[in-house]
Amino acid sequence: MQQFDLLGIGNSVVDVLYEVDEEFITNNKLEKDVMTIIDEEKAENFYSKLKQGIEVAGGSVANSTVGFASLSGKPAFIGKIKNDNLGKSFSKSLSNAGVFFKTEPIIDGPGTARSFIFVTPDAQRTMNTYIGACSLLSPKDMDEKIIKNSKITFLEGYVWEEDLAKESLVKAAEIARKAGNKVALTLSDPFCVKKHRLEFKELIKKNIDILFANEFEAKELCQTQDLEESAKEISNMIEIVAITRSEKGAKIYNAKEAVEIKAKVFNKVKDTTGAGDLFAAGFLYGLTKKFSILKSGNIASITAGEIISHFGARPKTNLAYLIQKELTE
């Protein structure tokens, strides 16, 4: 019997959230609604100049594992931190949420990663991320026993920045598939896709069963402005592709069908940070329970809807209870 339902492999990041206006984005020459990699100097500059932000343990796939745990699933996570205060905070947050996390921290070198997330009044988020210790994730960190004993291994596209990290993801995917398990990938960000498009396509063709992308990432991957065209191309490569479209919901494709998923909104949309992460959590949870792509997609819509109703990318409601309530009404 497998020990874990889901293993996430991704960046171990502490999010620092700020509510800002459009003028702040313009004045600081930030590229809105994407993730930009920054160096340690710029990260320290943000820390020293800005008022106290809301600090929450984050990281895209790490957020997904926390959401998965809240759904009553059994998740694990692999990611690199430093043995510093932020690293200890990150590790504790995962453990408290019910996520198994035992990756060895580094003692010397760059600090634990942090992401400055600037949320504008339209609820869009602009991220400036210092990768820090995440850059040292290596194939040695890929725990073969955990990978073999996880139903689905979920890889984070953001990690595809360092050569060692690339080797790590490929190694994990190969171990998982040889063990007869599924491998999922989130493309993470349009800029990330633009930068690594050909490498991502090769990875998807060789090692991925389930792909998550928003409509901009899917179009960038396939070099087309036609969403259906990009979905068809991706569907020919893999088993399942889920394409999220913000307030328009999502479309999910497999070899047999394409299903439309309506967006679920609880109250007002306050912060879209983590919407894709929690969509993935809900969908993958459904797949581990052998639900259809339609039912899994509806669960995903509910979990994403919860996360955008408040600040931060970690659920504030017991998702298992919420799903039970929403699906029985």
Go through each PLM region and give its residues.
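Active-site nucleophile and cofactor-binding loops and adjacent substrate-binding regions
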Residues: 52-60, 105-109, 274
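Glycine-rich phosphate/adenosyl-contacting loop at the front of the ribokinase-like
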Residues: 1-78, 88-89
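Conserved beta-alpha-beta core of the PfkB/ribokinase-like small-molecule kinase fold
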Residues: 152-232, 248-250
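Conserved phosphate-binding/catalytic loop of the ribokinase/pfkB sugar-kinase fold
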Residues: 102-106, 117-163
